[in-house]
Design a protein with these regions (language model features):
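Domain-scale detector for complete catalytic domains at protein termini or as standalone homologs
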Residues: 1-90, 97-254
């Protein structure tokens, strides 16, 4: 299988020597460009690599994946060039599930290269999604539910055609998010940090706490103020934690 990786990643570094990469997976409906600002606050030794899935950003004309096997197969193929060197993984919402699956893949394919997994705003692999399932809601109920989670009306597309395209993309991502399930507890040998929003109904403390069952290494659960979109409002808090962990790794000569 051949995967053209040229548009899969947004890569930003400080120009200084890279000691570790932070590979990020945005939430459902979000393009890689939305995490570009992270590079301004990351330590100079960390190279930022953000995944851009089909249907998002510069790939908006491509059909998004609607099933997990194809999504994972092509994501892994695109990331192979980056996974063979020291890296950490971060994902929010749907992105956290992709980060977790990539972590399992990299642990087998590139042993000892994944140094940390950060999951954010995402239920543990063995937790069932809350009902009703968002991706199956009628259009008006779907729009209301997204706004209730904390999405800003100002950030929603204004034109009717663009709004409908965005909603299809978001609904597709939420379907992947809500139909995924995994019971392979203890499968990781990698430190894991889990972030959750104090007012996020999609990923409560109970949902997030069970992530501890999926690693045999250190586990850290961190509450941050905000709703499901705390990845924006609490960006500096997240990056403070990430910089601390990846800074300690650099001090120990990765």
């Amino acid at each position: 299988m051949y995967t053209d990786t040229r548009q899969w990643t947004l890569v930003i570094n400080s120009g200084q020597a890279t000691r570790i990469r932070l590979i990020c997976f945005p939430q459902a409906g979000a393009a890689a460009e939305q995490l570009r600002v992270w590079s301004n606050s990351l330590a100079d030794h960390i190279e930022l690599v953000v995944i851009n899935l089909p249907g998002h950003g510069p790939r908006r004309d491509e059909a998004p994946y609607d099933n997990w096997p194809s999504l994972l197969q092509n994501t892994f193929a695109a990331l192979d060039p980056w996974l063979g060197e020291p890296h950490a993984l971060f994902g929010h919402g749907l992105g956290a599930l992709l980060a977790y699956e990539t972590c399992k893949y990299a642990q087998e394919r590139f042993p000892r290269q994944t140094r940390h997994l950060f999951v954010s705003g995402c239920r543990s692999p063995d937790s069932l999604p809350r009902r009703p399932l968002l991706h199956s809601l009628p259009i008006e109920a779907f729009r209301e539910a997204i706004l209730t989670l904390g999405a800003s009306p100002l950030e929603m597309p204004r034109g009717q055609s663009d709004l409908q395209s965005y909603e299809r993309l978001l609904r597709n991502g939420l379907k992947l998010f809500e139909t995924w399930y995994d019971t392979s507890s203890g499968s990781l040998d990698i430190p894991l940090t889990a972030f959750y929003g104090s007012e996020d109904p999609l990923a409560t403390a109970k949902h997030m706490l069970n992530w501890r069952e999926f690693t045999g290494r250190e586990f850290e659960l961190i509450e941050v103020a905000g709703n499901h979109f705390f990845i924006k409002s609490q960006r500096q808090r997240l990056l403070q934690v990430i910089n601390t962990h990846l800074g300690l790794l650099a001090e120990h000569r990765i």
